[in-house]
Structures are given as structure tokens and as C-alpha cells.
Amino acid sequence: MQKIGVFVCWCGSNIAGTVDVAQVVEAVRQIPDVAYAIDYKYMCSEQGQELIRKAVADYKLDRLVVCSCSPRMHEATFRKCAEGVGINPYMVEIANIREQCSWVLKDKAEATAKAIKLAKAAIAKVRFNGALKPGESQVVKRALVIGGGIAGIQTALDIAEAGYKVDIVEKEPTIGGRMAQLDKTFPTLDCSACILTPKMVDAANHENITLYTYSEVESVSGFVGNFDVTIRKKARSVKADMCSGCGICTEKCPSRKTPSEFDMGLKNRGAIYISFAQAIPKVPVIDREACIKFKTGKCGICSKVCPAGAIDYTQTDELITEKYGAIVLATGFETMPLDKFGEYGYGASKDVITSLELERLTNAAGPTEGHLVCPSTGKEPKKVIIVSCVGSRDVSGRGKSYCSKICCMYNAKHAMYI
């Protein structure tokens, strides 16, 4: 039979001011396997820990539940106390009745009822705990960064400069992410490309960094320090090791009806394309859904004009498995789907655009070479209205209830250079 000891802390008035600790003690005493239960003002104090040690000796306790503050505060304290009296430290469970109970509830009856439930849950958990021993395992000294935007690039550079190998996996054909689409940064209105492109080059040329562009993480298994990751390297239909990035294939492609993802659909691109002039790697990719060759078996112009013979229509996806000690998620953001917000006219009027579409219109390398025009007419607008917080702080359920924290800043930026 297990012998569980339950120790309920007052935490001064932090807990006892809202929770009836005596009632909690009385409730847990009725639970099978609870051999001892008591409350005390400060269970983490030396006097409180001595109370625990004495109870273990007197009642031959083999498992402990401490109802107190967050385990982030004192889990190590109580584990060390248990270990000192011969109880495996992993036979200790913390019921957080402060941050998760007394600090978030005002009604004493409600807080006490919740504290009892939390205590019961911890008791149920500790019944199934097993004695564990700390072990050691070799950590793979290689990191994976998922996302090749500015955050992912800078993270990879920092890790690489510290002397570790690091791989970047980016789903788009090039690194750069959203920052590559921007014209200027806030609040200094510095050139976005002037900041980003040197870092892109540094990442591509760093001896400790490997780029997996046009690739996605297929699966992750393992544990901290030892992850097994499968990466799907999608077929570009272009041999990267042979391509010089001359761009002849993209110029000659006759299929030019696909909206450019990089330019937010404000102009079209070819079926074979390079996202933007500073792309890294500067290797085109064939969009098989738009390519005449893949749809009909005809055309093949890009293969005919390629001076390096780099076009490969038979190329297939490649699965690569690597081991990593750490994984960083730097996956970036997407704009809020505006089909949920019909009152603004997005989709109904070509002249209602998103912030990223505005970025492309005002970018010197964008579809209008930096000239702000109305998409419907191609003429310069007389007035511009900026609607803030669309989809943010939304209580209707269509967007997010919280503030995006960035839209006010980029709205101010747009207003400044418009």
C-alpha cells in the first residue's frame, strides 16, 4: 500500500487569503493512500521542510504532494528535501494552488473547490510515478532552424559563429522571407534589402551553414539533444549544381499567367521563375501546375535555351534524414485571410489591398517600380485610407482576440512614406 503525504502551504496570505487551506487538508485526508496531510504557513521554509522530514519518518511516507506555488519556484526545493530523507525526488508532485488558483480567483468557496481538485489530481498523478535516476546522453552538436527569413538567418548566423553546424530549412525557393518583400524598415525607414541581402549572402557562404531551400520538414522524432528529422527537398526540375542563374529560361518561358507569390499577385510570373533578383540560391524552380511541358508534354523551351543544360523534368523529391541537438522554429507569419471581413471590400474592389500588397507597390523592385498606383486604373491615388487592427482585437470570432503588436508600427511607417 502506498503512503502519500500531502502538505498544503499558506504562502502567507497569497494562498490562505483566498483558499480555505484547512478545508483542503480535510478533503485530501479522505482519499485512499493519503497517510498524512497538514497545512503550514511557509512550507518552503526550513521549518516547513523539517515538518515534511518528520512526517516522512513518523508515517513512513513514500510519496509526497505539496500544494503550493508554481513548480518553477520550489519543485527543486521539495525534491531535494525528499531526497534527503530517502524518497526518490521524482516521487514528489506539486499542485499549483497559487498561480493557478488563489491568484486568479476571488471567491473563497470557488478557490477552495478548485484547490481541492488540483490536490486530488496531483495525488492521482503521484500514485503512478516511478523512481527515476538522472542519466546522461550525448548531445548532437548540430542545430536545425526551420524558416529562412530574417529571424532564421540571424539565428543560424549566431549559432554558426559560435562554432556549431546549423541547417536552415525554408519552404520557399529562396531564403529571405517576408523582409525581402518590404521596402523599408520601421522606425528608421532604412532600406530593407540593404540590411537583409548581406545576411543572406553571409548565411549562404558560411562554412557551418547548410541551406535546404524549397524544402519542408516531413517528420521529427527523438528528444531534446537528439532529434531525428526527415526533410523533404522538393524537386525544382532544375539541377542546382549546374545552374548559373543567368535567367534566360525565365525570360523565354511562354507561360506567364501565374500570379507572383512574391509580388502578392500584383503581377504575373512564368512557370519557371526566380522569386526576386537577390534570391539565394539564384536557381529557378518550375511550377509544374503552370508548366506547359508538365501539363501537355509539349513546349520544353526552357530546356532548349538553357546554356548549362540544367533543366531536368524527371527530377523527383528527395528525403533527407539528419540528426540535430536543437531545433529553432522561425516560421514567420501570414496575413489574416480577409475573406472573413467583407465589410472592407477586399476582393470586391481591386483598390482595397493588404499591407503586404502595399509594400510591393511602394517597393522600387516591385511590380510598379515603387510608384503607388490604384491597381484598378494604374493611376496615382489622391487619398489613401489605412484601416488598422483588421483581424486583431476581434471579439466576433473571425480574427484574433489579441493585439498583433505590429500593425500600428507598420501603419505609421506606411503613412510616413506615402
Language-model regions: role of each:
Residues 1-17:
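A short, flexible N-terminal coil/short beta segment enriched in small residues
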Residues 21-35, 43, 51-54, 80-97, ...:
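N-terminal glycine-rich dinucleotide-binding loop that anchors FAD/FMN and/or NAD(P) in oxidoreductases
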Residues 43-45, 213-225, 288-290, 317-318:
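A conserved short coil-to-beta-strand element within the FAD-binding core of flavoproteins
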Residues 47, 57-59, 102-176, 234-321, ...:
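Rossmann-like dinucleotide/flavin-binding elements
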